[in-house]
């Protein structure tokens, strides 16, 4: 451990997919003393089923399997867009995902590429960090959920939070998934800062 790190004051903060990481890590690593999961992915397969129409799901699974077989056979790595206009295939198929990534790419991240590997999507679907959410306790756990989140659905996050043990705190902020980053930044950042300060600075 680096000398500037206080091992008794290690806190984790994650948002969206990285929230999955902090949930999983804090369930098993007691060095973590406080954790905040913002607009979290809690169960990738359940989440994916919300984003893909039921009648298209078997074809999507077959497409992922075909990509895997093709990669093993040819070594070729295939890509798909992270976001795309409605009706086109993308890893994050919600309208607010398209709006946010497109705007952010233009204004704040001009070198960002709108692509990810198909294999990454398939592997991500195996991720179920909330299966172990009950093991986070006694580490203080805060979950920040957007009231109208359609990318990492609000009800999935709240259900996972219900299975966590004390000490815990649920914060519900107005808006959708991406409001936590811009329009609703203060409503998300302030409780997170207070939670980390309360449990790491005492």
Where are these regions (language model features)?
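Alpha/beta-hydrolase-fold catalytic nucleophile elbow
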Residues: 13-15, 36-39, 174
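Gly/Ser-rich "nucleophile elbow"/oxyanion-hole loop immediately N-terminal to the catalytic nucleophile
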Residues: 1-11, 15, 32, 67, ...
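Short beta-strand/loop motif that positions the catalytic acidic residue
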Residues: 136-137, 143-145
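Conserved alpha/beta-hydrolase "acid-adjacent" motif
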Residues: 145, 150-156
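Alpha/beta-hydrolase-fold enzymes
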Residues: 21-101
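Active-site nucleophile elbow and catalytic-triad environment of alpha/beta-hydrolase enzymes
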Residues: 51, 115-133
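Gly/Ala-rich beta-loop-alpha elbow adjacent to hydrolase catalytic centers
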Residues: 14-18, 22
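Catalytic histidine-centered segment of alpha/beta-hydrolase-like enzymes
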Residues: 175-189
């Amino acid at each position: 451990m680096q000398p500037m790190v206080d091992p008794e004051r290690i806190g984790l903060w994650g948002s969206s997919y990285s929230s999955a990481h902090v949930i999983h890590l804090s369930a098993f690593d007691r060095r973590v003393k406080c954790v905040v999961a913002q607009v979290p992915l809690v169960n990738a397969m359940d989440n994916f089923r919300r984003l893909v129409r039921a009648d298209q799901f078997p074809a999507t699974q077959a497409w992922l399997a075909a990509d895997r077989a093709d990669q093993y056979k040819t070594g070729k790595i295939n890509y798909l867009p992270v976001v795309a206009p409605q009706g086109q295939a993308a890893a994050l198929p919600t309208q607010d995902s398209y709006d946010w990534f497109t705007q952010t790419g233009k204004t704040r991240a001009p070198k960002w590429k709108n692509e990810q590997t198909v294999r990454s999507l398939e592997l991500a679907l195996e991720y179920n960090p909330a299966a172990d959410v009950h093991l986070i306790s006694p580490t203080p756990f805060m979950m920040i959920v957007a009231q109208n989140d359609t990318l990492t659905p609000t009800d999935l996050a709240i259900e996972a939070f219900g299975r966590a043990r004390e000490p815990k705190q649920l914060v519900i902020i107005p808006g959708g998934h991406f409001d936590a980053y811009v329009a609703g930044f203060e409503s998300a950042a302030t409780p997170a800062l207070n939670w980390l300060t309360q449990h790491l600075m005492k």
